[in-house]
């Protein structure tokens, strides 16, 4: 009876880009949970619908009563059952009635309320008493594409991961050191650079792709040498953003070039080889499993070839990718699929097939820290949540607190 839901409330709040989103409160007899939904700038076509046509305001006026009337009186700990009720209330296969963001906020808030009812942190409630590993933070250093602006690189995110870190504080600090080093190098290259940032806290410079790649690579090498902590580079290409369906080419506007599918595969493979990338996300557009598989065959032994728009945290789509041997890693964003249950099912399938799950933020974030708990609970070895900015640091600082609570903590196995 401790986790019986007594009240559910939804409210409109603002995300890090100044856009409205939804926050859910779930109150039980003996606990309380609060969670907020993020939003993406570059989104996969197969993601669930974020909000109904009337947006957040419709959620507050119409949907709150629909949800509360159905789940008040249920046990918050019965997360699967509550997630199924959310689907039944919605009645569609993509949450177009209540919105995937609404569903995921309620789903996460319910799990947090259940954990609170038993005086447990969320990671222990979901993962049991066994979690001992902390994920490596994959930090955003330079923003381009949909996350930046005019004259920024075409490639959306230039990332780093401190694979040599021995604890989460060292990992976070190392990423921040690289972030600062990159700023200094950008200022050397462009004297007019004033420190502008993109949506995810990475620098938004006036650089070509090649200039950004060189700065990223040399900064990783220098910080690795100076600190003794090995840092490796990564990319989120977000290639669906510049795929031209009519031309059947990848159009790099900043570069003034375009590439066929085969040229794109060769280009990314060459980048992985030249710059020793540890991780490359969405190097191929979201509908091309065949090309994704070809790149994985070429470069997957040396690098994580990660699908975000390709898989959209959807177990059915992931199963298709597994069959095609497309990628060896996937992004996990709960609001892409709408519930914690479906998020967990996708992670479970990924692990069973040796795909590396990367729990991730969105470009439009809040100070909600839930994904830090999910990464630990579900034993994801990597968390992608930026390197700077309050809404990014909220997750990283939560990992510091979680690490303090773990018995014999260690960094994850990569």
Curated annotation (Swiss-Prot):
CDD domains: enolase. The active site is at 200 (proton donor), 333 (proton acceptor). It catalyses: (2R)-2-phosphoglycerate = phosphoenolpyruvate + H2O. SMART domains: Enolase_C (SM01192), Enolase_N (SM01193). Mg(2+) binds at residues 236, 281, 308. Its cofactor is Mg(2+). GO terms for molecular function: magnesium ion binding; phosphopyruvate hydratase activity. It is found in: Cytoplasm; Secreted; Cell surface. SUPFAM superfamilies: Enolase C-terminal domain-like, Enolase N-terminal domain-like. Gene3D superfamilies: Enolase-like C-terminal domain (3.20.20.120), Enolase-like, N-terminal domain (3.30.390.10). Keywords: Cytoplasm, Glycolysis, Lyase, Magnesium, Metal-binding, Secreted. (2R)-2-phosphoglycerate binds at residues 156, 333, 362-363, 384. Pathway: Carbohydrate degradation; glycolysis; pyruvate from D-glyceraldehyde 3-phosphate: step 4/5. It comes from the Archaea. Binds a second Mg(2+) ion via substrate during catalysis. GO terms for biological process: glycolytic process. Catalyzes the reversible conversion of 2-phosphoglycerate (2-PG) into phosphoenolpyruvate (PEP). It is essential for the degradation of carbohydrates via glycolysis. This is Enolase. It comes from Methanosphaera stadtmanae (strain ATCC 43021 / DSM 3091 / JCM 11832 / MCB-3). The lineage of its organism: Archaea, Methanobacteriati, Methanobacteriota, Methanomada group, Methanobacteria.
């Amino acid at each position: 009876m401790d986790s019986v839901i007594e009240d559910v409330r939804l409210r409109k709040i603002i995300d890090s880009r100044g856009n409205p989103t939804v926050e859910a409160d779930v109150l039980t007899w003996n606990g309380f949970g609060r969670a907020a939904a993020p939003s993406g700038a570059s989104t996969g076509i197969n993601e669930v619908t974020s909000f109904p046509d009337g947006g957040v305001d419709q959620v507050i006026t119409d949907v709150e009563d629909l949800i509360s009337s159905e789940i008040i009186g249920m046990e918050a700990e019965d997360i699967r059952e509550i997630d199924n009720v959310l689907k039944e209330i919605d009645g569609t296969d993509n949450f177009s009635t209540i919105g995937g963001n609404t569903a995921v906020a309620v789903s996460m808030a319910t799990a947090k309320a259940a954990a609170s009812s038993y005086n447990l942190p969320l990671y222990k409630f979901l993962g049991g008493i066994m979690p001992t590993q902390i994920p490596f933070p994959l930090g955003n250093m330079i923003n381009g594409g949909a996350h930046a602006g005019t004259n920024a690189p075409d490639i959306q995110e230039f990332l780093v991961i401190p694979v040599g870190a021995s604890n989460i504080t060292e990992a976070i600090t190392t990423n921040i050191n690289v972030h600062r080093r990159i700023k200094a190098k950008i200022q050397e290259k462009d004297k007019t650079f004033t420190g502008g940032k993109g949506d995810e806290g990475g620098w938004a410079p006036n650089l070509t792709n090649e200039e950004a790649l060189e700065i990223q690579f040399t900064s990783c090498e220098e910080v690795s040498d100076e600190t003794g902590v090995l840092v490796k580079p990564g990319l989120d290409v977000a290639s669906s953003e510049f795929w031209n369906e009519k031309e059947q080419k990848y159009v790099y506007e900043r570069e003034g070039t375009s590439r066929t599918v085969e040229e794109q595969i060769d280009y990314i493979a060459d980048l992985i080889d030249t710059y020793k990338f540890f991780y490359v996300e969405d190097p191929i557009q979201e509908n091309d499993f065949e090309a994704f598989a070809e790149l994985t065959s070429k470069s997957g032994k040396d690098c994580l070839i990660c699908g975000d728009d390709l898989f959209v945290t959807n177990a059915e789509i992931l199963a298709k990718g597994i069959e095609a041997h497309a990628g060896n890693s996937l992004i996990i964003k709960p609001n892409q699929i709408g519930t914690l249950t479906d998020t967990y099912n996708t992670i479970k399938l990924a692990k069973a097939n040796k795909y590396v799950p990367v729990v991730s933020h969105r470009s439009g974030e809040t100070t909600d820290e839930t994904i830090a708990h999910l990464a630990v609970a579900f034993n994801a070895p990597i968390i992608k949540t930026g390197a700077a900015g309050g809404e990014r640091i909220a997750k990283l600082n939560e990992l510091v607190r979680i690490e303090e609570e773990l018995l014999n903590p260690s960094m994850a196995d990569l």
